[in-house]
Every structure is written in structure tokens, then in C-alpha cells.
UniProtKB/Swiss-Prot annotation:
Protein source organism: Vibrio cholerae serotype O1 (strain ATCC 39315 / El Tor Inaba N16961)
Name of the gene this protein is made from: clpS
Signal peptide: none
One GO biological process term: protein catabolic process
Complex and partners: Binds to the N-terminal domain of the chaperone ClpA.
Record-linked HAMAP family: ClpS
InterPro entries xrefs: ClpS, ClpS_core, Ribosomal_bL12_C/ClpS-like
Pfam families (UniProt xref): ClpS
Task of the protein: Involved in the modulation of the specificity of the ClpAP-mediated ATP-dependent protein degradation.
Family according to the record: Belongs to the ClpS family.
Name the record gives this protein: ATP-dependent Clp protease adapter protein ClpS
């Protein structure tokens, strides 16, 4: 039989695990910002399409954007938040709307 593993110490315990603290990933809010040009119906469509909101919730968030200047659409890990911002921005530009979507650390 081959002795390929002679270099492993006989004191080595395969069941021994090093305890490491695993931190949860940083989270980010995806935020829609108000402008004077994007129609309210389009904002609702964005919220339904990209954030899986029903019509009632999408309308509430749209009104918050309209009256308060911005609203959080969701909270995600950095990669997911970046993707959502890019999708919303691209879809808005394709439809000739200046809707501003940003991300902020939660």
C-alpha cells in the first residue's frame, strides 16, 4: 500500500475545526428618487417588474417617492442591489425616462 500521506502529522484530527466568525454580508437599500418627468404609472411598473410588488404596495411606494422625494424599494446584498439598479436604469432609459435609481448602505 502506498504511503502518500506520511507528511500528515499523526496528531492531526480530521474532525477538529477552526472556529471562525462568519459575518453576514453588507446590505444595501435600492432607492427610487423622484423627478418631474417620469410618469407615476411607469414607476409602478418598475416596482412590479423588478421588485415583485403587487399593485397596492407598488402604488404606496410610488406615492412615497412622489411626496417624499425618494423611497426604498428593497434591501439586498451588494451584488443584487447593483444588479437591480442597473436593470431599473437600463429599462428606464430604454423607455426614455430619466428615473434615478440608486443604492445606499443599509
Amino acid at each position: 500500500m502506498s504511503k502518500n500521506f506520511e507528511w500528515i502529522s499523526p496528531d492531526f484530527d480530521l474532525l477538529e475545526k477552526e472556529k471562525t466568525a462568519v459575518k453576514p454580508p453588507s446590505m444595501y437599500h435600492v432607492v427610487l428618487n423622484n423627478d418631474d418627468y417620469t410618469p407615476m404609472d411607469f414607476v409602478i411598473e418598475i416596482l412590479e417588474r423588478f421588485f415583485s410588488m403587487d399593485i397596492e404596495r407598488a402604488t404606496q411606494v410610488m406615492l412615497k417617492v412622489h411626496y417624499e422625494g425618494k423611497a426604498i424599494c428593497g434591501t439586498f446584498t451588494a451584488e443584487v442591489a447593483e444588479t437591480k439598479v442597473a436593470q431599473v436604469t437600463m429599462y428606464s432609459r430604454e423607455n426614455e425616462h430619466p428615473l434615478l435609481c440608486t443604492m445606499e448602505q443599509a
